[in-house]
Amino acid sequence: FLPIVGKSLSGLSGKL
């Protein structure tokens, strides 16, 4: 997976 995708998933998880 690309680093951007990983960051996006991490950001969403953090928001939730």
Curated annotation (Swiss-Prot):
Signal peptide: none annotated. Disulfide bonds: none annotated. One of its GO terms (cellular component) is extracellular region. Keywords: Amidation, Amphibian defense peptide, Antimicrobial, Immunity, Innate immunity, Pharmaceutical, Secreted. Expressed by the skin glands. It is found in: Secreted. The keyword Secreted applies. The modification Leucine amide is found at residue 16. GO terms for biological process: innate immune response. The keyword Secreted applies. Its main location: secreted. Probable antimicrobial peptide that can stimulate insulin release in INS-1 cells in a dose-dependent manner and without increasing the influx of calcium. Belongs to the frog skin active peptide (FSAP) family. Temporin subfamily. This is Temporin. It comes from Amolops loloensis.
